[in-house]
Amino acid sequence: MDYKIVRKENQKERLWTGGVSKELYIYPDGSTINSPFNFRVSTASINPGEYNFTSFKGYKRLLILLSGSVKLEVDGRDYYLKPFSHIFFSGDSHTSSLADETSIDFNLIFKENINLLDFKIVETEFSGNSLSSKAINIFYNLEDNRHIRVNNNEYTLGKEDTLIACGNNFNIEGSGRGIILSLDIKI
């Protein structure tokens, strides 16, 4: 079992036309947003105004709004997002946002060879086991100083810290508000 914690202060920031994106994790390790990758998890601010999203041809996307309110237009259809609502859409889609206030979203961009086994927005206690030997499980913490246990080892996550656990034979449990993703890589 392999796992790591990406602390808030170690997240890679990059500007996009509508704000700032913070990369939580990209797979495989060593990939960049400008090179081929299998999946990328990030958060992004969306400033007030109207902005076009970057196109990711050949990828799928999951966006979960964390704060604020945003109107997304995806291929001409409007979606109104409030905190903790989500939307799946194609990375090929023409997508734009309209926000009256600064908003924050959580993003997963993933290729066809990635199977999203599960995603949860957790409010209190949570636990889970690896669902596959090729699974990558991600927990994004939304609260200050939450205690997480991975195979009986305890860690403290600060707000916006991310835990990544890969492989099989592990158990994760904890309490607090956050987002859990479980991804499986198809070979």
Label the predicted regions.
Residues 1-187:
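Jelly-roll (double-stranded beta-helix
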